[in-house]
């Protein structure tokens, strides 16, 4: 996968290219990340990349000419078929479904805004899609771009040690992930659930599914509203709810 980045701070993306899962993907040739800075397309001695907005008001906008030239350079390097994405609070909110859609692209160019944003005409002429990572404001589009890259890269074949890792992550089936445990078996008096030590793979799968359903019900109940539960899932969720209610009653009785 090729990902081009247009950013005033390309050095920030070393967090993606040099470290962790994405760093290994770059090293192994599964992911190519290249950056273009609008500053490299300025023609004044101050390398100016911001300009005043028409109509006044606080803040500045990214200057049109260097931004467009940087986007054009990224498009030329990417070749045909590259989707140009602007990271913006006004964009579609990134979720698991969106990540899967984006992962189907072989080429993407991510445009990272700064200041108060970019000229609307640049959006109309250069941008294919706008994406957001949440209903809050950041200083620029670099962190959202890194979030998008990290989430999408997990779906590139060969990036993860086991492809099942991506398939079993939270939200992969519309549910939150189940609890996980590693050594030691006992930590400050808290034991690993015995079923995970049993070696019974069918029971382990059942336990994990029940915990996943229960955790979703407790923490993100709205996710369940959009799911058509299987008969097994409905039974397991009902079991979890009964067990949770019993624990709550025991706790209240001991307080």
UniProtKB/Swiss-Prot annotation:
Recorded catalytic activity of this chain's protein: guanosine(37) in tRNA + S-adenosyl-L-methionine = N(1)-methylguanosine(37) in tRNA + S-adenosyl-L-homocysteine + H(+)
Entry binding sites for S-adenosyl-L-methionine: 113, 133-138
GO MF annotation terms: tRNA (guanine(37)-N1)-methyltransferase activity
Keyword Methyltransferase among record annotations: yes
Keywords: Cytoplasm, Methyltransferase, S-adenosyl-L-methionine, Transferase, tRNA processing
SUPFAM superfamilies linked: alpha/beta knot (SSF75217)
Location of the protein in the cell: Cytoplasm
Superkingdom of the organism of origin: Bacteria
Catalytic class of the enzyme: transferase
GO biological process: tRNA N1-guanine methylation
A Pfam cross-reference name: tRNA_m1G_MT
GO terms under cellular component: cytosol
Chief location category: cytoplasm
Summary of subunit composition and partner proteins: Homodimer.
Described function: Specifically methylates guanosine-37 in various tRNAs.
NCBIfam families: PRK00026.1, trmD
UniProt cross-references to HAMAP family, sorted A to Z: TrmD
Family per record: Belongs to the RNA methyltransferase TrmD family.
Protein name: tRNA (guanine-N(1)-)-methyltransferase
